[in-house]
């Protein structure tokens, strides 16, 4: 099972170069498991297993038969976005005979890791509607050929790089090369039009980003690692979706409503219509309860007894940088998911949540670790505190560990994928 889940994660990530593709991949997994897709503006079926996609965000739920009014939700959240390089609205540049694309750095990307890589292009494109309305047609785009490259400066021309390290100005030094100028090549908009088989005049706007073309792979002497991209946080998104599929296939110890949420925009603060700080999830939860004929009091009772797991990747100890970690709470690859704890509530875990997840892992025969950062280093955060405050539900932050977080190429333990899937499945079913 562990090897199966590891291979499944590699396939999931390779199929998901952007948040929009990640939602499409997760939607396909759910659809094959019998979940039906609904639209926000339509009336939803009562009960059953459904999912909603809005941009780079997906929410899915499974309502068992004869669920009691006011029974709590079991929620698991993750995010679909990863730090990367994104294409600007007017991106075309010409310098010294080269055609280039201007980019923005999205999130806290380790920009140096994007240098000298074969880069493709992916995301979504908004097209002029064919029916004459104002609602654009949106299509996914994926170009999986070596289209772009950010070339590093040779050390012969920058002698200080060896002693002072690499420093990059993203405005001037992280501008991908698209081709040579002056060769009657079609413009960027025409390139997109050719890929989509539309007129360039019909392209209105885009949300496009660069992606590394190297596929994911098993790594290490015993193939105990996974080397891939976007582990933060497609590693968790895959585990969350697989847990939902597996829980829907089996029986639960007692009827409860299971909900998973894969949010966009976590890497830039979550304060968007599709982010965890927005109103999408509370609205979906209330609509589920209304569809079951619950009153407002039933819904509020359900929220008061609900529990949320925020699943986001964690920091495994890097043997080359041991001094950056809290020595009493080191995480190791293939040693199971970690419960994340922070006294300043940068993680939402409290003692009750910690005990709950530890009990779930024990029931599923999954090893568990604890993670805390150093007291003298500021702690990152997740969607956990945002959702805990927004929903008022008990929340625990967890995640399986990795190396090189926010790099264009990351590393995790192959066995940890199965550990995480098993733990989350147990949470949704026990």
Model-identified regions with their sequence ranges:
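N-terminal hydrophobic/helix-forming segments and targeting peptides
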Residues: 1-430
């Amino acid at each position: 099972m562990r090897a199966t889940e590891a291979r499944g994660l590699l396939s999931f990530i390779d199929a998901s170069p952007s948040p929009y593709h990640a939602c499409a991949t997760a939607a396909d997994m759910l659809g094959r498991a019998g979940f039906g897709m609904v639209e926000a503006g339509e009336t939803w079926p009562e009960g059953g297993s459904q999912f909603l996609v809005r941009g780079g965000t997906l929410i899915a739920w499974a309502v068992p038969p004869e669920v009691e009014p006011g029974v709590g939700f079991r929620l698991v959240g993750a995010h679909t976005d990863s730090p990367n390089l994104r294409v600007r609205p007017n991106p075309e540049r010409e310098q010294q005979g080269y055609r280039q694309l201007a980019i923005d750095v999205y999130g806290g990307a380790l920009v140096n890791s994007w240098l000298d890589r074969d880069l493709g292009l992916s995301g979504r494109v908004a097209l002029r509607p064919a029916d004459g309305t104002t609602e654009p047609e949106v299509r996914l785009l994926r170009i999986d050929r070596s289209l772009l490259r950010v070339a590093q400066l040779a050390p012969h021309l920058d002698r200080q790089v060896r002693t002072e390290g690499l420093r990059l100005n993203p405005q001037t030094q992280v501008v991908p090369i698209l081709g040579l100028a002056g060769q009657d090549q079609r413009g960027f908009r025409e390139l997109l039009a050719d890929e989509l088989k539309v007129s360039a005049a019909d392209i209105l706007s885009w949300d496009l980003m660069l992606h590394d073309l190297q596929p994911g792979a098993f790594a290490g002497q015993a193939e105990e690692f996974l080397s891939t991209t976007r582990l933060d946080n497609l590693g968790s998104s895959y585990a969350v979706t697989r847990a939902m599929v597996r829980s829907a296939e089996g029986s639960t110890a007692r009827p409860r409503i299971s909900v998973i949420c894969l949010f966009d925009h976590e890497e830039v603060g979550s304060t968007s219509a599709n982010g965890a700080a927005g109103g999408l999830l509370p609205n979906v939860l209330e609509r589920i309860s209304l569809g079951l004929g619950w009153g407002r009091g039933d819904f509020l009772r359900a929220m008061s007894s609900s529990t949320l797991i925020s699943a986001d990747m964690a920091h495994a100890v890097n043997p080359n940088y041991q001094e950056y970690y809290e020595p009493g709470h080191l995480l190791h690859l293939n040693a199971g998911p970690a419960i994340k704890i922070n006294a300043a509530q940068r993680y939402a875990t409290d003692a009750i949540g910690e005990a709950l997840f530890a009990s779930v892992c024990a029931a599923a025969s999954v090893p568990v670790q604890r993670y805390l950062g150093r007291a003298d280093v500021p702690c990152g955060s997740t969607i956990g505190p945002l959702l805990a405050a927004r929903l008022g539900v008990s929340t625990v932050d967890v995640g399986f560990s990795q190396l090189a977080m926010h790099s264009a190429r990351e590393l995790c333990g192959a066995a940890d994928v199965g550990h995480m899937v098993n733990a989350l499945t147990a949470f949704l079913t026990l």
